[in-house]
Amino acid sequence: MMSNNLYIVRHGKMLIEDSKKPDYLHLSKEGTDFGLFLDNYFKDIYFDHIFYQSVDIKTSDPYNRCRSTIRGTKGIKTEFDKTQLSKMFDTINKEENGRQNVLLCFRTEAFNVISNIVGTDTDEFFNKDYNRIFHFNFSSNNYNFVKKVNTEEI
C-alpha cells in the first residue's frame, strides 16, 4: 500500500526586541531565505493540498505570514483557522485514493494541536524548532515520522 506524505513547515521566530528587523518575518532576511529554501526544496513536488494558517487579528502572530513563506510551492492552497485543524486532518485522512502529498504551514499557536494529531512524543518536537520541515508518512490516521529538515544545516 502506498503511503501519503505530510510535510509540516514550521515558520520562523523573530526576536521582537530587535528593532532593526522588518515588522514582518517573511520580509526579513531570515524569512526570505527560508521562503527561497522551501521553493527549492519542494520544486519537484506537486501538493494535492497546501494548508496555510489564516491571519486572525485577535490571535495571530504578526511576524508570520505562512502564505508568503510558501509562495512558490505548487498545489492547491487553502487557508485554515487553528480551530479547524482537527476537521482538516479528518478530511486529509479520508482520502485513500492512491498517494497524496500534503503541506501544512503553521505558526506558533498551532503546534500543540498538531503535536496531538500526529502523535509526536512531546510538544518540544515542534516547540523549539523554527524554520524547519517535518516529514511524515501517513495512512488511515496513522502518522510515522520520517525526518526533520533543518535549513541551517544544509
Where are these regions (language model features)?
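Residue-level preference for the first positions of well-ordered beta-strands
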Residues: 6, 99-105
